[in-house]
């Protein structure tokens, strides 16, 4: 946010990620990410990618997917249907639900830029 200098002061932006959220699982992930990425904190979509992979893993485990090539189309549908309407998914940051492929209670965050720094303003939940 330094490129715009003082012209960015007061500009509000949204993000899927608030690095200040704290829970044991997220804190452990942040530390491991920083270690693997030269001290950088996770990027805004990092938790989304992480959750997507673990949601697919959970779908495979809970729907009886076998990996049988003869059932490929059927089993892919099981995974997709599970993920599209999962309830109580324990994600990296919080527990959340999906309805028809859309998160129903997953927050976004509003930040305001001041002197090149993003400052938290508000958590917004659908």
Residue ranges and their predicted role:
Residues 1-126:
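Extracytosolic ligand-binding ectodomains
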């Amino acid at each position: 946010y330094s490129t715009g200098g003082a012209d960015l002061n007061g500009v509000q932006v949204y993000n899927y990620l608030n690095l200040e959220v704290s829970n044991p699982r997220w804190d452990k992930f942040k530390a491991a990410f920083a270690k693997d990425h030269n001290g950088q904190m996770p990027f805004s979509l990092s938790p989304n990618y992480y959750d997507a992979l673990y949601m697919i893993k959970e779908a495979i485990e809970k729907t009886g997917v076998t990996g049988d090539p003869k059932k490929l189309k059927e089993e892919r549908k099981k995974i997709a249907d599970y993920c599209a309407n999962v309830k109580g998914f324990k994600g990296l940051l919080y527990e959340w639900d999906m309805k028809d492929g859309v998160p129903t209670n997953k927050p976004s965050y509003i930040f305001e830029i001041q002197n090149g720094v993003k400052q938290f303003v508000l958590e917004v939940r659908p």
